[in-house]
Curated annotation (Swiss-Prot):
Family annotation (InterPro entries): ACP, ACP-like_sf, PKS_PP-bd, PP-bd_ACP, Ppantetheine_attach_site
Pfam families per record: PP-binding
Protein family membership: Belongs to the acyl carrier protein (ACP) family.
Domain Carrier: 2-77
GO biological process, alphabetically ordered: lipid A biosynthetic process
Pathway it works in: Lipid metabolism; fatty acid biosynthesis
Protein name: Acyl carrier protein
Main localization, broad class: cytoplasm
Cellular component GO terms, alphabetical: cytosol; membrane
Transmembrane segments: none
Positions of post-translational O-(pantetheine 4'-phosphoryl)serine modification: 37
Subcellular location(s) of the protein: Cytoplasm
Role according to the record: Carrier of the growing fatty acid chain in fatty acid biosynthesis.
Length: 81
């Protein structure tokens, strides 16, 4: 079973079409990975679906880096899925 970090990286690579090597913990979705506002919304939706969680808009706005996503999902995922 993939770790949360591995799964998050996989989703980012698929959604943004970036190289896996670019997806580092401190990589900003917008500044480093070239995401626009629509991309970030789609990323959050993909995280919600993959990890079976609900991410409120006010929390989604705070998820700006790979580490932010991993930390949020780790704290909120049901049963670590």
């Amino acid at each position: 079973m993939a770790s949360v970090e591995e799964k998050v990286k996989q989703i980012i690579v698929e959604q943004l079409g970036v190289d896996e090597g670019e997806v580092t913990p401190n990589a900003s979705f917008v500044d480093d990975l070239g995401a626009d506002s629509l991309d970030t919304v789609e990323l959050v939706m993909a995280f919600e679906e993959a990890f079976e969680i609900e991410i409120p808009d006010e929390d989604a706005e705070k998820i700006r880096t790979v580490k932010d996503a991993v930390d949020y999902i780790t704290a909120h995922a049901k049963g670590g899925k």
